[in-house]
Amino acid sequence: MTGDGVCHTYIAASADPEMCVPIVINAKTQRPSACNAMETLLIHKDVAPKVLPAVANALVAHGVELRGDTAAREIFADMESAADEDWAAEYLDLILSVKIVNSLDEALAHIARWGTGHSESILTTDYAEAEEFLDRVDAAAVYVNASTRFTDGGVFGLGAEIGISTQK
């Protein structure tokens, strides 16, 4: 059995807005049916008003259906309301859950509760915050300023994927 992939990308308050859109688009739309595709986007509240509209518009332009918490829907109204089951969903489709968080601790708690230990990513320019994310998140592959889509047998130099589990 291969690993389930409820993969997250966390956009930290210090994230470079210019890098957010291309990384998020790749993580969700490059191959949405893959187990390493992002299923939930977490955004720090301080950067959400600036970053979420740009990211959400780009996702919608790529055909992604968005499901957000109340705070996300207040910033970008063109999304459905997320239910608890959305946070645990491996959609394997052009559907993405979006949640606004107050801190790195809240993002890590969300990942710990709903993640599957497959692949997690943080977008940040703060080295200490990146190190803390790397140290504290429990996943087989953890990225800084990169797409979760890099978790791949070929990219890791392991050859073709035939039911390779990348879970811890």
Regions picked out by a protein language model, each given a short descriptive name:
Residues 1-93, 144:
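ALDH superfamily catalytic-core signature
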Residues 83-168:
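Conserved C-terminal structural/oligomerization subdomain of aldehyde/semialdehyde dehydrogenase
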